[in-house]
Design a protein with these regions (language model features):
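Start-of-helix register in tetratricopeptide repeats
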Residues: 16, 49-50, 83-86, 120-121
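Periplasmic peptidoglycan-binding/tethering modules of Gram-negative envelope proteins
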Residues: 102-212
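Residue-level recognition of tetratricopeptide repeat
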Residues: 23, 56, 90-93
Length: 287
């Protein structure tokens, strides 16, 4: 389904005319023609609407490289965080189609952080990817690509707008690693140990030698608040010890924090066991 956006384009009669023609072509499922009209629209005047719709039209045709470029352009031109979040989410959706699920999840989660009321399709897409990768090993290259996008790519250019229209500081780069402890314990399973080995290899690279990292442990929502806080701290400590043991150069550069159940990805007591598992996670912030 080709969903036209509510126009945010300033006065630009020629660009608007081509944009309207593109919407008509899209509604008729003629996405190739829609792209042609949208290319003419952005030639007349750059606009968020035209670039975002071009991303959707290219995505529909599985022209993934072109779709990623269009969504990136749209994000740069977004009039507000809400619009930027939608384009970032579509960018993530396109990455998933390209097999880059870990990087896709990074995009979708950032979009949900930015949007005041994320549409259900963003949440559902993120959850499905989350479920698909939770039992999969994470490669060093996936972690590096995710960080590169946050530090030098699309997300590096995203700022939250303040009331006066200026830009605030960027959000710290972060990595989220699925972790699986034995129930009510701090014992790491084999997959988590392998994922931490990939994480440690990245954090110990020369490019990060002057950086410190904050490890934040999260629990599921079962149990008392204080108990979960203590458990998350203990788990973060266990992860710190695992990393330092295998990567001594990280000693003294890791800070730990237990978030307990304060920031669940999936809220409520009556959620599935899979959702409880996804709430148990490690976030790594680069300071």
């Amino acid at each position: 389904m080709f969903i036209p956006l509510k126009s945010t384009q300033a006065s630009c009669p020629e660009g608007n005319r081509y944009l309207d023609l593109a919407k008509k072509s899209g509604s008729q499922q003629d996405f190739s023609q829609a792209v042609t009209w949208l290319e003419r629209s952005v030639e007349s005047c750059d606009s968020y609407d035209a670039w975002h719709l071009m991303g959707m039209a290219q995505q529909k045709q599985r022209n993934l490289k072109e779709a990623l470029n269009a969504y990136s352009q749209a994000t740069e031109l977004a009039p507000n965080d809400q619009s930027a979040a939608i384009s970032i989410a579509r960018y993530g959706q396109t990455l998933a189609l390209n097999g880059q699920r870990y990087e896709a999840l990074t995009m979708l989660e950032r979009a949900m952080d930015m949007h005041p009321n994320p549409p259900s399709w963003i949440q559902n897409t993120a959850k499905q990817i989350d479920l698909n990768i939770v039992d999969q090993p994470i490669s060093r290259e996936s972690i590096k690509r995710s960080l590169s996008t946050q530090e030098f790519g699309l997300l590096a250019n995203v700022r939250s707008k303040t009331k006066d229209g200026s830009k605030s500081e960027t959000v710290s780069s972060r990595i989220r690693i699925p972790i699986n402890f034995e129930y009510d314990s701090i014992n790491l399973d084999e997959l988590t140990q392998k994922n931490l080995a990939q994480l440690g290899a990245v954090l110990s690279e020369d490019k990060y030698r002057d950086r410190t990292f904050t490890l934040i442990g999260h629990t599921d929502v079962r149990g008392t608040t204080q108990y979960n806080h203590n458990l998350s701290e203990s788990r973060a400590e266990a992860i710190e010890q695992e990393l330092v043991e295998n990567f001594p150069e990280l000693k003294g550069r890791l800070k730990i924090k237990g978030a307990g159940e304060s920031s669940p990805k999936y809220k409520g007591q009556k959620i599935s066991e899979d959702e409880h598992r996804l709430n148990r996670r490690l976030e790594v912030f680069i300071n």
